[in-house]
Amino acid sequence: MVAYAYVAQYPSEVDRIVLMDAFLPGVGDWKTVWLLRDLWHFHFYGETPLKLVAGRERIYFEHFWNDFAADPKHSVPEADRQFYARSYAQPGAMRAGFEVFRNFEQDAKDFAQFAETKLTMPMLVLTGEKASGEFLIEQARLVDTNVEGVVIKGKGHWLMEEAPSQVIPQLVAFINKSQ
């Protein structure tokens, strides 16, 4: 989302863009995703959620690491889980994370406006079959005329952790392509 927001505002500063398994609020049928019951965390922000999660960051994130992976055994490694839990336990970290979701409605307004002017640069969209699947690729085609979409079969949201041997070559090949 951050990459799209940047490139939509400053397209002359970017040669190409990669989106990985995060939908674009305000583009196409975005509310279908935004309102999915399983994605309740999009609406979980403010003081009460902060108090509920404080001191329980690891428990909160375990749900996402496990349930958003195609196979929890090949999701985020234990050392990384410990690092993220420690990091998000720092003052202000969870609030900052929750604010991403609080701002979805404003992002939707901004992205809808950005989408009125289609990008023309090469865009690679990598998404997990058991996560966004074709949805993100379809969204990308609404905002860019030069989209290459790849659905990583049998994988979920954590593409770098679940399928590095598939993702890294895709990234390298895309980055090294000449326009």
Question: Could you tell me what each predicted segment is?
Answer:
Residues 4-151, 160, 172-179:
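Flexible "cap/lid" subdomain of the alpha/beta-hydrolase fold that forms the substrate-access gate
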Residues 155-168:
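Catalytic histidine-centered segment of alpha/beta-hydrolase-like enzymes
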Residues 1:
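Ligand/cofactor pocket segment of small-molecule handling proteins
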